Amino acid sequence: MSVKGITPQELAAYGIHNVSEIVYNPSYDLLFEEETKPTLEGYERGTLTTTGAIAVDTGIFTGRSPKDKYIVRDAITQDTVWWADQGKGKNDNKPLSQEIWNHLKGLVTEQLSGKRLFVVDTFCGANADTRLQVRFITEVAWQAHFVKNMFIRPSDEELARFEPDFIVMNGAKCTNPQWKEQGLNSENFVAFNLTERMQLIGGTWYGGEMKKGMFSMMNYLLPLKGIASMHCSANVGEKSDVAIFFGLSGTGKTTLSTDPKRKLIGDDEHGWDDDGVFNFEGGCYAKTIKLSEEAEPDIYHAIKRDALLENVVVLADGTVDFNDGSKTENTRVSYPIYHIDNIVKPVSKAGHATKVIFLTADAFGVLPPVSRLTANQTQYHFLSGFTAKLAGTERGVTEPTPTFSACFGAAFLSLHPTQYAEVLVKRMQAVGAQAYLVNTGWNGTGKRISIKDTRAIIDAILNGEIDKAETFTLPIFDLAVPMALPGVNPDILDPRDTYADKAQWQEKAEDLAKRFATNFDKYTDTPAGAALVSAGPKI
């Protein structure tokens, strides 16, 4: 049969044959019916909750499977991809031969052939000049729902002229029994082919593989065109001033970029081109563990009809226990971005960023709550992507655990990290943007820097007060730290002042500096990385 938008002949070109029916770009109402059919079993089945949202389970895969990620190594990718088996840096870009790719593609197309399929055409990227037109093909209704939530939904006029740049075939029900002979990690796979412009998924039901798969591809394609591709949140003020927030989990990225005085551009993935900053996505993928209306009202109220909950515990009466992490701590909800009130409309993009904020939660008690970065320090700290967590031990002693993630998103980088740093700084320098390192972590008192002080710091950055402040240079890290800021406790700005004995800060600072240097060594395999060593801490 032929359905508006795509024909069985087009699917046959991908290797999918004898399709019984094509459900093309289904409406939310149709998806609701499909997901709640009483005949569905296993992970295909959706459960209606009292919030109005559907809840689904993804089985043993409650997060991404980075060890099962592969990219075909060929003439296009050989000298461009940041490969896992080359250079000093560790990453997830494991090479795959064309022969094994063909085998995996055969498994997925065989799984999808003869089935009733959902085909969803979407955009990745809010800027029409640089967006990817992505076609998702799946046999599972809620997976179609997920991508409808997460990607940008084309208008009917745009669908009429839609020509896919990239195909994602999700064969979650199939696995690869020959994985051992082929030298792969397991029977599951998430594989990419830049020449064929295609992603294959097998064995894992986790929705985030589709979202982050396309992020990895944007991270390949855009920087090669001189466009920054960023794992960050972004917002815009009343004077059209744009700020972007980088930070790993637990640093306050979502909380601090959600500001009643500013409109949200997006919460996770953005590009920065000649026109300005733009969202890659048309939705949000928020963590829900321990979610409460008081702490996260925007997310809480976004969980309603058309939202899709993943791996939450649903009680017999349909209520959701957000505090129950028995399935996973990584419980999630996806929803279209318009479920949030204070957003940029109608297109999730704005002008050039003037403020770039790197968030870190330093559990070592060394870094100041805020500092201004030079251009080289901007690249150094962007490549370092540092945060740290406090981990309790059996005797109640707490030892900080450092985390370094290149560009605050190493898992999704397809090119060498220095390429992202270079493009970001070029974009910043072209418009005179300034970067700041903001520490939302701990200091010498053993207490975390208060959210009140951190919000006042962010306000001082956004309204320009910080640029008028006198600064001093913090030794070892060579950071320019303001001496006073409106609304900020002056006793915390110099981290040394939070210690009864300043020698204690010195000792911890030297230890952390060594960790920075050890981590940064992996970027010195390129001239660009080697040139930045001097912008790091001095041991």
Curated annotation (Swiss-Prot):
**Compartment(s) where it occurs, according to its Swiss-Prot or TrEMBL record:** Cytoplasm
Q: Where does substrate bind?
A: 64, 206, 212, 332
Positions contributing to Mn(2+) binding: 212, 231, 268
Q: In which pathway does it act?
A: Carbohydrate biosynthesis; gluconeogenesis
Q: Which UniProt keywords apply?
A: ATP-binding, Cytoplasm, Decarboxylase, Gluconeogenesis, Lyase, Manganese, Metal-binding, Nucleotide-binding
Q: What is its EC number?
A: 4.1.1.49
Q: State the reactions this protein catalyses.
A: oxaloacetate + ATP = phosphoenolpyruvate + ADP + CO2
The organism's superkingdom is given as Bacteria
Name any GO cellular component annotation. cytosol
InterPro entries associated with the record: PEP_carboxykinase_ATP, PEP_carboxykinase_C, PEP_carboxykinase_N, PEPCK_ATP_CS
- Binding site residues for ATP: 212, 231, 247-255, 296, 332, 448-449, 454
Cofactor names: Mn(2+)
Q: Which GO terms describe its biological process?
A: gluconeogenesis
Gene Ontology MF terms in the entry = ATP binding; metal ion binding; phosphoenolpyruvate carboxykinase (ATP) activity
Q: Name one Pfam family in it.
A: PEPCK_ATP
Q: Which residues form a coiled coil?
A: none
According to the record, cofactor stoichiometry and binding are noted as: Binds 1 Mn(2+) ion per subunit.
Q: Which residues form the signal peptide?
A: none
By sequence similarity, the record places it as follows:
Belongs to the phosphoenolpyruvate carboxykinase (ATP) family.
Q: How does it assemble?
A: Monomer.
Q: What does this protein do?
A: Involved in the gluconeogenesis. Catalyzes the conversion of oxaloacetate (OAA) to phosphoenolpyruvate (PEP) through direct phosphoryl transfer between the nucleoside triphosphate and OAA.
Protein's name according to its UniProt entry: Phosphoenolpyruvate carboxykinase (ATP)
Lineage at the top is:
Bacteria, Pseudomonadati, Pseudomonadota, Gammaproteobacteria, Enterobacterales
User: Which gene does this sequence derive from?
Assistant: pckA
